From Swiss-Prot:
Main location: cytoplasm
Top-rank lineage group of the source organism: Bacteria
Keywords annotated in UniProt: Cytoplasm, Methyltransferase, rRNA processing, S-adenosyl-L-methionine, Transferase
Name of the molecule in the record: Ribosomal RNA small subunit methyltransferase C
One MF term in the entry's GO annotations: 16S rRNA (guanine(1207)-N(2))-methyltransferase activity
Organism listed in the record: Yersinia pseudotuberculosis serotype IB (strain PB1/+)
Gene expressing this chain: rsmC
Length: 347
């Protein structure tokens, strides 16, 4: 059995409740509990591609990855187990979508760590379900209620936008830097002083702001953007479209679905998975970069100054340089060198 999060351990304290139920798991699910869950039926809707990868081999067509849940995925489900995410707006968006499809009378279980803000679930859903706290353990809260009324849901109403110079950035709940350009990305963009061309991969693209701003400066770049978040993927596509920029945007867990090599990889890599601190994605980004860069290709990333990336860069590339820094962030660059010549081979 794989390791379970505290929230899943709380759910298992009530496992007898679910044996005869047709359960839908959704929200910030970060483990394989659905694959080993004892219920009459189990389905999963996830907005995170790496969570889909974790579950798809076992649950096959019963796990769906995407921005919006569909009636087909939710068909026959009589119980929702929702894992509360870090972002309250993301919870509002996802629950409005799910509860607009699930039938009245559906049992709703909301679980999350106390520090995630799960306490606000009662007030958020008050017009549609009367939730009550039924358990508190492992620094988590578990709430239960029954759907009394379906909310109205219009996905288009959740879009927002802001400007970065002449670039319009389209965003959705749960996307990094939803309201404005973050200071780390601003510092990273400041290091691109001259136009350049070639193939560039943006890992963890968020709303597509890096590619869209740099495309204004260097229109000959061939862009590939990737993210694990379905909301980020859709936001990037919308940002690129409104700014008339052509690019490939794909779901990928760092390099899992990336093909080919690039002249440059750029990233403002996350160091959280939900509310948990995690350097896994950044470590995968750095360690795998040389396999996805041409000789002479560069990895350029921005990160909080306290994160231990210099040692990772030196281990992967042999060296690195700091292109810019301020009180909080540093921009690192590492270059793929030519492999040493084999003296046994004839020239």
């Amino acid at each position: 059995m794989s390791a379970l999060t505290p929230a899943s351990e709380v759910i298992l304290r009530h496992s007898d409740e679910f044996i005869a139920r047709h359960v839908l798991f959704a929200g910030d699910l970060q483990d394989a509990l659905p694959a080993q869950f004892d219920a009459a039926g189990v389905r999963v809707h996830t907005n995170q591609y790496h969570h889909w990868q974790l579950l798809s081999n076992t649950l096959e067509e019963n796990v769906q990855f995407g921005l919006l849940a569909t009636a087909e995925t939710l068909a026959a489900c009589d119980t929702l187990i929702y894992y509360w995410p870090k972002s309250k707006q993301e919870a509002q968006f996802q629950l409005a979508n799910l509860l607009s499809i699930l039938p009245v009378g559906t049992d709703i279980f909301v679980v999350g760590e106390n520090r995630s803000g799960v306490r606000s679930a009662e007030e958020m859903l008050a017009d549609f379900a009367q939730l009550a706290k039924i358990d508190s353990a492992r620094r988590c809260g578990l709430y239960h209620g029954r759907l009394d009324k379906q909310p109205e849901f219009d996905a288009d109403a959740w879009w927002e936008s802001y400007q970065v110079g002449s670039v319009t950035v389209k965003t959705l709940p749960g996307v990094f830097s939803r309201d404005s350009l973050d200071s780390g990305s601003h510092l990273l963009l400041s290091t691109f002083n001259e136009p350049f061309k070639g193939s560039v991969l943006d890992v963890g693209c968020g709303a597509g702001v890096l590619a869209s701003v740099l495309a204004q400066q260097s229109p000959k770049i061939k862009w590939t953007l990737s993210d694990v978040s379905a909301a980020a993927i859709e936001a990037s596509r919308a940002t690129l479209a409104v700014n008339n920029i052509e690019a490939q945007v794909i779901a990928s867990n760092v390099y899992s679905d990336i093909k080919g090599r690039f002249e440059m990889i750029i990233s403002n890599p996350p160091f959280h998975d939900g509310i948990q601190t995690s350097l896994t994605a950044a470590e995968m980004l750095i360690r795998g970069a040389t396999a996805h860069l041409h000789v002479g290709g560069k990895l350029r990333i921005v990160a909080n100054s306290f994160l231990p990336y210099p040692a990772l860069l030196d281990a992967a590339f042999g060296s690195h340089e700091v292109l810019a820094q301020n009180g909080r962030f540093k921009v690192y660059q590492a270059t793929v060198g030519r492999p040493p010549r084999d003296p046994k081979k004839k020239r």
